[in-house]
Amino acid sequence: MKSYMAKTNEVERKWFIVDAEGKTLGRLSSEIAKILTGKNKPEYTPHVDTGDFVIVVNAEKVVLTGKKLDQESYTYHTGHPGGLKQISFRRMLAEKPELLTYHAVKGMIPKTRLGRQMLKKLKVYAGENHDHEAQQPQALEL
């Protein structure tokens, strides 16, 4: 029996909506990464994007355990001399809560062209409202 290899034009993508309220950031992000990569499907193929679209709402109400709010931070460089910047999780959660969830999922996706394509299917919103009612997303309980 031959192994099945999915083709790009045969993949059927669904839309899922996830409520992040009260969920732990890392556990939520790993489940979202599985859906984006398509590893939850039986027709998963490593070189084809078989994943589904994921909408995350209430990103501002995500939970971090322990002292991570104060101790952990994201580091980035502006590209200019002396441009190394750090932003703590507490500040990021207060200013741009959707970026905290986005970066957590981004770290769990492959760092390739295919990974960047998978990450485009992630839509994160700080509050309850989102712009994707026309896609009729299915509620997903993680």
UniProtKB/Swiss-Prot annotation:
GO terms for biological process: negative regulation of translation; translation. GO terms for molecular function: mRNA binding; structural constituent of ribosome. One of its GO terms (cellular component) is cytosolic large ribosomal subunit. Keywords: Ribonucleoprotein, Ribosomal protein. Part of the 50S ribosomal subunit. HAMAP family: Ribosomal_uL13. Belongs to the universal ribosomal protein uL13 family. This protein is one of the early assembly proteins of the 50S ribosomal subunit, although it is not seen to bind rRNA by itself. It is important during the early stages of 50S assembly. This is Large ribosomal subunit protein uL13. The gene is rplM.
